[in-house]
Amino acid sequence: MKNCKKKILCGFLAGAVLFASGCGNKDTQDQAKVQRYAWPLGSSSPEDTVTQIYAEKFAEEVERLSDGTMLISVYPNSVLGGDRELLESCKEGDIPFVVQNTAPQVTFMPDVAVFDMPAVFETIDEVREHVDNPDFLSMMQQVYGDAGYVLLGYADQGFRVMTTNRNVQSISDFKGQKIRTMENSYHMAYWKALGASPTPMTFSEVYIGLQQGTIDAQENPYEVIVSNKLYEQQDYVVETNHLPHLISLIVSDEFFEGLTGEQQEIIREAAETAKEYAREQSDERIASLSLIHISEP
């Protein structure tokens, strides 16, 4: 499978080089009018997600703002690799663009763990205000820059919430519940502090785990709960809102620096528009949910 992905990627890169190798001269400008291959953007998320909406809107805006001379193709569902592979390929310049949750990035950029501190924010508007703050954004851009990426912005899928078959009304109701978490020490420490029993598990095993009773509960943003039909195995959503589920849009620093100033500006403007659009879509999706009981402990 990895060899297959490498072959696919090599084909993308060959085309990308044809377009990007001569940026800045007249021949390249003429060539750009008939860009033969689109730059790949990789994601590990399924199609029907805000992550995909974010990626597709970005690609659409890049094409619109460049009058069709800059093209990006979005590849979801880990077609170009899982989260770790995408980050590695992006850093090496093999996959120019990646859209993904910030949690997998902590291994590469430990300071990104700032988003793993639980119960810091009360509303998603407060989260957005902070991540858009010029000073904070500048610091995070430096973190990504030091690692070989250019951070173009953060959208989100709202907060992460808990699903369970227990009607949680107080802190004591968390006690003993086996809850699936990502393999993240900060996440696990939070649930331990509440008295629950955090159980790291790959996401592909969550539905079966709930069905077979291997785990009692899990935590994810609403959209993931709905798109993966976890409500079929769970009766309650507990609005813990313990962490914002942030989605980053990044580009390889090496690739970005090889573009003209005009192209870079188009990419930044497209990213800003896509970010705002993705946030609107996230809010609308969350507001439309009515599949399971919601409790607020």
Description of each model-found segment:
Residues G11-F12, F136:
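Generic detector of short alpha-helix boundary/capping microenvironments
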Residues F19-G22:
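C-terminal motif of bacterial Sec signal peptides marking the signal peptidase cleavage site
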Residues G24-E126, D135, Q142-S295:
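N-terminal secretory/targeting leader peptides
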Residues G15-A16:
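Repetitive helical segments and hydrophobic/amphipathic motifs
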Residues M1-L9:
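Bacterial N-terminal signal peptides that target proteins for export
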Residues L9-G11, E296:
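Intrinsically disordered and other compositionally biased segments
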Residues E129:
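Short beta-strand-centered segments that line the small-molecule binding cleft or hinge
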